[in-house]
């Protein structure tokens, strides 16, 4: 499998106003963007809309999405879907004209004390689901710890497990996307970077989530973007309030969504933007919004995208 390099950065140049036009006035700086018009494929967590994949697909299509991120179908988590269910899900999505951007697995969303093989077995199951749905991306996490244990206490155990998961992924031709979930080892920019640098695998990249960083007291763009951008391959769209941690529509919280989106565009990002609103409820395996709230979240993000001259398709 070819090594995946970081998306190249694109700079801007500053042009002075022509001498004849200045008339003794101060030089006017004009920012000339060298970034081509951005087009981002739009996706979303279907089960935030409804348990029924047909309803999920209909709503996403109505909101202009071309893809869906699959976490569960008919109320069954992807880690427990039978082959027949995966085949039926693929049929439904094909009929609707939706492709799958990623499988949002629960791998790594367990205590680090469980044996390495526990999550490897679950990842093997998820890989079969990803193949059935024709996507290379699988969302994962970097393990919880028991009360009283520090992040440093579990670091080595986490890195062993993340390395084993990445090795299986690379062997299988898929790419793992680490989400910076609150409470896991990799919930701060510094520890996410530690995972990326320590594992050093082309099959382990970042699913960036602004809201999750806010919930652990981090200013996402200010404190984490430059550090993690070389590994950022997938954008999960969520915002949150710093005071309460409440998830809110894009641009209404403290997640620095506007700055992040502008920077991604300037850097030439062309990957998925996946809506994960969590506007009605959140729980251990995900969250729920319902069709109306999901639409609110989609429109809020679309407004920020339009402001930054990004076309969502």
PLM feature segments, named:
Residues 2-10:
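Extreme N-terminal basic, low-complexity initiation segments
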Residues 5, 23-24:
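Residue-identity detector for glycine
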Residues 19, 26-29:
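Charged/polar low-complexity intrinsically disordered segments
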Residues 11, 34, 52-58, 91-95, ...:
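Active-site acidic/histidine proton-transfer and metal-coordination neighborhood
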Residues 69, 102-104, 139, 177, ...:
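Conserved beta-strand positions in the central sheet of alpha/beta enzyme cores
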Residues 11, 28-66, 94, 134, ...:
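Histidine-acidic metal/acid-base catalytic patches
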Residues 48-50, 72-74, 106-109, 142-146, ...:
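Active-site-proximal loop/turn and secondary-structure-junction residues that shape catalytic pockets
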Residues 70-93, 143-149:
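Glycine-rich, proline-tolerant flexible connector loops at the mouths of alpha/beta enzymes
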């Amino acid at each position: 499998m070819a090594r995946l390099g970081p998306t190249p950065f694109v700079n801007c140049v500053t042009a002075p106003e022509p001498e004849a036009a200045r008339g003794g006035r101060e030089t006017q700086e004009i920012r000339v963007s060298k970034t081509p018009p951005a087009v981002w494929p739009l996706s979303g967590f279907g089960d935030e809309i409804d348990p029924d994949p047909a309803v999920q697909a209909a709503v996403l299509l109505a909101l202009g999405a071309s893809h869906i991120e699959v976490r569960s179908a008919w109320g069954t988590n992807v880690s427990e879907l039978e082959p027949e269910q995966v085949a039926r899900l693929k049929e439904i999505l094909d009929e609707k004209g939706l492709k799958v951007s990623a499988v949002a697995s629960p791998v790594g969303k367990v205590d680090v004390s469980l044996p390495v093989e526990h999550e490897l077995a679950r990842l093997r199951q998820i890989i079969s689901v990803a193949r059935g749905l024709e996507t290379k991306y699988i969302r994962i996490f970097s393990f919880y710890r028991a009360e009283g244990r520090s992040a440093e206490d579990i670091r080595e155990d986490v890195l062993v497990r993340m390395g084993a998961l990445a090795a299986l992924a690379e062997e299988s031709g898929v790419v793992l996307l680490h989400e910076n979930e609150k409470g896991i080892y990799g919930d701060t920019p510094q520890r996410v970077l530690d995972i990326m640098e320590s594992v050093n695998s082309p099959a382990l990249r970042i699913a960036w989530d602004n809201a999750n960083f806010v919930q652990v007291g981090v200013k996402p763009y200010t404190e984490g973007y430059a550090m993690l951008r070389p590994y950022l391959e997938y954008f999960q769209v969520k915002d949150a309030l710093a005071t309460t941690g409440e998830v809110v529509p894009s641009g209404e919280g403290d997640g620095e969504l506007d700055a992040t989106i502008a920077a991604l565009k300037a850097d030439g990002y062309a990957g998925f933007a996946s809506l994960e609103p969590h506007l009605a409820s959140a729980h251990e395996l995900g969250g729920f919004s319902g069709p109306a709230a999901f639409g609110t979240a989609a429109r809020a993000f679309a407004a920020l995208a339009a402001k930054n001259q990004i076309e969502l398709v």
